[in-house]
């Protein structure tokens, strides 16, 4: 999307749609007005009253703009950054659906001007995302966007917002790919293709290297498929030499049948989304490079296809992981923790990071506990967890911290191995899965995000204008924003 900004007079702006925001009960539009416009705006306000989620419009005869389109923000005291982001997305979709070539949006002058410019960009870019790779009829070009306002820092804010939304779009695009078009090998090739800058490089370990390296979890889960596993490693060195990196790990099961412990057939097609954690990591890495952040970040994506077959791993097997610890397999559909454990241990040992964050569509139990709008979070470090919570509030990608202690750790102890890949019955499934991961690392500050409920739009997902159907890219904005804050 082509985006520009200035502080020009809205009444003199030549555009197909002059757009703005309205507070509930207000007589005018926030940040939008001028000679000849005020009466037209009042007319449009009368059609929606500024109620959140409502769109109204009116023609603008005799003016440079062709029409005015207004989005309601709700009561003045309840306006949030995500409210502006959401309604900007609603305006963008309205403009696209009308087939207009361009639109101008007036920043409402409620929050920081540069922040408002970024929110408008995020809402519009994310709302207009379309996955049409396999359709004969493509979506076509997005309408051009001009932001009225945003202050002297608008240009930088817009550029940064576009870098982050490009990362989200990249993650969504990979996650939405069907399993026949995105096995582990192709996911690895997509990561290699992404690494074009001088500060970023990609290494992809194949099956022989994984066997030799002792990645027992990745090998076990992937051995039932003709599509061999990969370990994708993306290194971004934007910080000082010797500066400890932050390691990001993402689960990428390109299709999960459950293996021998096979899943029900209903909705199994959605298991293409079991790679969303890895796609999130790659999206963050893309955003970090585009932002040129002065930090060192490592993205590690273990990728497998979990299939049943004569060579598949079985319930009852004992698998030796990269850490040297052994895992008793009680259910082959609890595979994500096995590949993540290998990647976490490898990342900590090789890179000695300052922090580790992992992302995974790990447990259905997380959806039972938290639904489809909040990700589960488990951490071994209170200060780190609070920083991630703060970042999530800024991007409206909500997380909820769950406890972890010795009682939970004891629930994955095995009588025949160091641990088991299932907890006890249906109790605390999200936490016992995280406990398995905690066993893979030492004392490095660590946050685990279970995004099973938030990674793609599901029936109970709260519909937001900037989250169209399919993968959401959850976590890209959150962690890209967190890393940006750490770099400042």
Swiss-Prot record:
Chief place where the protein resides: cytoplasm
Signal peptide: none
Biological-process GO terms, alphabetical: proteolysis
Binding site for Mn(2+) 1: 256, 333, 335
UniProt xrefs under InterPro entries: Leucine_aapep/pepB, Macro_dom-like, Peptidase_M17_C, Peptidase_M17_leu_NH2_pept, Peptidase_M17_N
Positions of the catalytic residues: 263, 337
GO cellular component: cytoplasm
Disulfide linkage: none
Binding site for Mn(2+) 2: 251, 256, 274, 335
Keywords attached to this entry: Aminopeptidase, Cytoplasm, Hydrolase, Manganese, Metal-binding, Protease
Cofactor binding note from Swiss-Prot or TrEMBL: Binds 2 manganese ions per subunit.
Reported cofactor(s): Mn(2+)
GO molecular function term, any single one: manganese ion binding
EC number: 3.4.11.1, 3.4.11.10
Reactions catalysed according to its record: Release of an N-terminal amino acid, Xaa-|-Yaa-, in which Xaa is preferably Leu, but may be other amino acids including Pro although not Arg or Lys, and Yaa may be Pro. Amino acid amides and methyl esters are also readily hydrolyzed, but rates on arylamides are exceedingly low; Release of an N-terminal amino acid, preferentially leucine, but not glutamic or aspartic acids
Residue runs in coiled coils: none
Subcellular location: Cytoplasm
Similarity comment: family membership: Belongs to the peptidase M17 family.
Cross-referenced PANTHER family: CYTOSOL AMINOPEPTIDASE, LEUCINE AMINOPEPTIDASE-RELATED
Record function comment: Presumably involved in the processing and regular turnover of intracellular proteins. Catalyzes the removal of unsubstituted N-terminal amino acids from various peptides.
Name under which the protein is recorded: Probable cytosol aminopeptidase
Protein species of origin: Cenarchaeum symbiosum (strain A)
């Amino acid at each position: 999307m082509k985006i520009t900004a200035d502080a020009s007079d809205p009444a003199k702006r030549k555009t197909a749609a002059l757009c703005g925001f309205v507070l509930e009960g207000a007589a005018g539009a926030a940040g939008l007005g001028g000679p000849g416009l005020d009466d037209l705006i009042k007319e449009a306000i009368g059609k929606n009253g500024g109620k959140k989620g409502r769109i109204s419009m009116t023609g603008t005869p005799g003016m440079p703009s062709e029409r005015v389109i207004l989005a309601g923000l709700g009561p003045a005291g309840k306006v949030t950054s995500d409210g502006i982001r959401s309604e900007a997305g609603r305006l963008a979709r309205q403009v696209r659906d009308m087939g207009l070539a361009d639109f101008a949006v007036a920043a409402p002058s409620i929050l920081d001007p540069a922040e408002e410019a970024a929110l408008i960009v995020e809402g519009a870019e994310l709302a207009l995302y379309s996955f049409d790779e396999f359709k004969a009829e493509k979506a076509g070009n997005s309408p051009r966007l001009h932001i009225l306002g945003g202050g002297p820092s608008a240009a930088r804010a817009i550029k940064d917002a576009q870098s982050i939304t490009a990362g989200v779009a990249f993650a969504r695009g990979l996650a939405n790919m069907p399993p026949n078009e995105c096995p582990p090998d192709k996911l690895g090739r997509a990561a290699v293709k992404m690494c074009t800058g001088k500060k970023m490089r990609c290494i992809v370990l194949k099956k022989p290297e994984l066997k030799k390296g002792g990645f027992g979890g990745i090998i076990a889960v992937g051995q039932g498929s003709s599509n061999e596993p990969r370990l994708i490693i993306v290194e971004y060195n934007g910080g000082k030499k010797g500066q400890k990196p932050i390691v990001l790990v993402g689960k990428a099961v390109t299709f999960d049948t459950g293996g021998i412990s096979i899943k029900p057939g209903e909705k199994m097609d959605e298991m293409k989304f079991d790679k969303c954690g890895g796609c999130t990591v790659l999206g963050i890495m893309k955003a970090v490079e585009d932002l040129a952040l002065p930090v060192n970040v490592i993205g590690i994506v273990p990728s497998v296809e979990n299939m049943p077959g004569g060579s598949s791993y079985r319930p009852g097997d004992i698998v030796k992981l990269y850490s040297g610890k052994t895992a008793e397999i009680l259910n082959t559909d609890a595979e994500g923790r096995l590949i993540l454990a290998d990647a976490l241990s490898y990342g900590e040992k090789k890179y000695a990071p300052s922090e580790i964050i992992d992302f995974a569509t790990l447990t259905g139990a997380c959806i039972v506990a938290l639904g489809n709008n909040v990700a589960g979070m488990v951490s071994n470090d209170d200060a780190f967890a609070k920083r991630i919570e703060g970042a999530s509030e800024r991007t409206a990608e909500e997380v909820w911290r769950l406890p972890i202690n010795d009682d939970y750790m004891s629930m994955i102890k095995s009588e025949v191995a160091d641990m088991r890949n299932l907890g006890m019955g249906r109790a605390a499934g999200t936490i016992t899965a995280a406990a398995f991961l905690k066993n893979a690392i030492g004392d490095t500050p660590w946050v685990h995000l279970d995004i099973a409920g938030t990674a793609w739009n599901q029936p109970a997902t709260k519909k937001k204008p900037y989250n169209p159907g399919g993968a959401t890219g959850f976590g890209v904005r959150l962690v890209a924003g967190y890393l940006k804050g750490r770099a400042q």
